Amino acid sequence: MINNNKWLVVGLITSCHGINGQLKVKSLSDFEERFLKPGIRWLQKENEPPSKIELTSGFKQPGKETFIIKLQGINNRNQAERLKKCKILVKTNKLPKLKKEEFHLLELINLEVKTLENEELKIIGKVINLENEKNNLLVVELFKNKKKVLIPFVKEIVPLVDIKNNFLIINPPNGLLDL
């Protein structure tokens, strides 16, 4: 998610791993090197400004979308516990360059969700989050009842994404939006 037009949240620290200060991170990014390649990262605790920290190592957990990372100065479980729920950020001006029709998945958050009904576009909700354990899923809050539905982010169901105009169009199969 884009945070104050300056930061992009690329990961969430979910828990500790072991006793030597390693951290488990849920990735919100398509760029694995953010959690593998040593270097400077930014960490944000709730309601605090981001702070600089150095990633010393990282690896992807086999078969999962989570990473185990080691940060400089975090050497035991007690220190690691204090970082649970922290966000890992990158500056938006440091995002990798994409091709013309490409976009960062996190740019989908807060887009209006529209459907085509009787040749007319109808706004039905907005993207409030992403789930990406195995496949990318849009978490959409429906305006009519405030319920949350998961929409598979595949071309057949989401044929159009218009970042510039802040919306996407879905073509849901029967029953997908029924709650």
Curated annotation (Swiss-Prot):
GO terms for molecular function: ribosome binding. GO terms for biological process: ribosomal small subunit biogenesis; rRNA processing. Keywords: Chaperone, Cytoplasm, Ribosome biogenesis, rRNA processing. GO terms for cellular component: cytoplasm; ribosome. InterPro entries: PRC_barrel-like_sf (IPR011033), PRC_RimM (IPR056792), RimM (IPR011961), RimM_N (IPR002676), RimM_N_sf (IPR036976), Transl_B-barrel_sf (IPR009000). It is found in: Cytoplasm. Residues 100-176 form the PRC barrel domain. Belongs to the RimM family. An accessory protein needed during the final step in the assembly of 30S ribosomal subunit, possibly for assembly of the head region. Essential for efficient processing of 16S rRNA. May be needed both before and after RbfA during the maturation of 16S rRNA. It has affinity for free ribosomal 30S subunits but not for 70S ribosomes. Binds ribosomal protein uS19. The PRC barrel domain binds ribosomal protein uS19. This is Ribosome maturation factor RimM. It comes from Prochlorococcus marinus (strain MIT 9312). The gene is rimM.
